[in-house]
Amino acid sequence: CNVITFHNPVRLAEDIALLDQLSNGRVEVGIGRGIYGREAINMNKEADLKDQAKNFRLFEETLTIMKKAWTEKFFSHKGEFYTYPTPNFTWQHDMSPPSEDFLDTKTNEIKKISVVPKPKQQPHPPIWQVVDGARSIEWAAQNGLNTIMWIPTVKALKTRFEIYRDAKSKAENRDVPLGEGVSLVRDMFVAETMEEAEKLAGQHIVNYMKWVCHWRGLGNHMDPGEELPETKHKLDLLNYDFLHKRNLLFGTPEYVVNKINELKSELNLQNLQVWSNFPGIDHKACMRSIKLFNDEVIPK
């Protein structure tokens, strides 16, 4: 997964295409705009999250260039942030015969560039955009992208899934089933007992969510129309019990199976990504959790 606004689009497209070739066409590309301002301003000043509209324009243009690089033998681009090739650059080399495919043969000025190799998958690997708000969800559907969602409750996710389904159905002129093109990320820790899961991982996930919610608040954790009591500090309500009932796959194998089945029955969930190595988790405990998930959850 890449925060594409932080990267040169031609370099990123080339790296992904090469990886797709090396993996024999098994790459799936995750993309996002970024959520942390201190990263954005240091990686690419044009991606500064203080200007969300500009950040989105950069995101859109970057993705456009990547798709051109993957799908066109030679391509050019002139946009707000990038121009390819660089204007007025001439090229002459005895071992590189001039071609009208990419060169003005009268002036030797390069008119187009290319990325080699192209991806193994054609026209390009599947693209998954991390989304949250309705506008981003609709944009992804309208532009042929799959989506990745993370925190919301089942009730809140239902609305998001429906927005994506409706926009994708309209864009593709077909009845898209609920759940198609959506992948859900859930924080997961499996243990022998509910108490052990909380003891080994509870405070670590709370600490991590406090980090995330410092910027985002608790809104993404709430059901539609839910109102929380006022507190002195915005994160006073954020504890294990608050999180567990809303969006955690923390508990016994049986409990986790039941929660996944709920996601399938309510959302027709087709793609689940589990996040199990969040900050603070003991490595052995994490690996034990993954083994329990593999042995006692996946088969059911």
Predicted regions and their residues:
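An alpha-helical appendage that flanks or caps ligand/catalytic pockets
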Residues: 52-118, 155-269
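A conserved active-site cap/scaffold subdomain adjacent to cofactor or substrate pockets
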Residues: 130-156, 160-161
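Short glycine/threonine-rich loop-to-helix capping motif typified by GTGT followed
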Residues: 190-195, 282-292
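Short, acidic/polar
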Residues: 15, 131-138, 255-262
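Structural preference for beta-strand elements that scaffold enzyme active sites
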Residues: 26-30, 126-128, 146-148, 179-183, ...
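Conserved, mostly hydrophobic/aromatic
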Residues: 19, 66, 127, 140, ...
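Glycine-rich, proline-tolerant flexible connector loops at the mouths of alpha/beta enzymes
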Residues: 3, 35, 151-154, 275-286
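Glycine-rich anion/phosphate-binding loops
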Residues: 4-21, 250-258
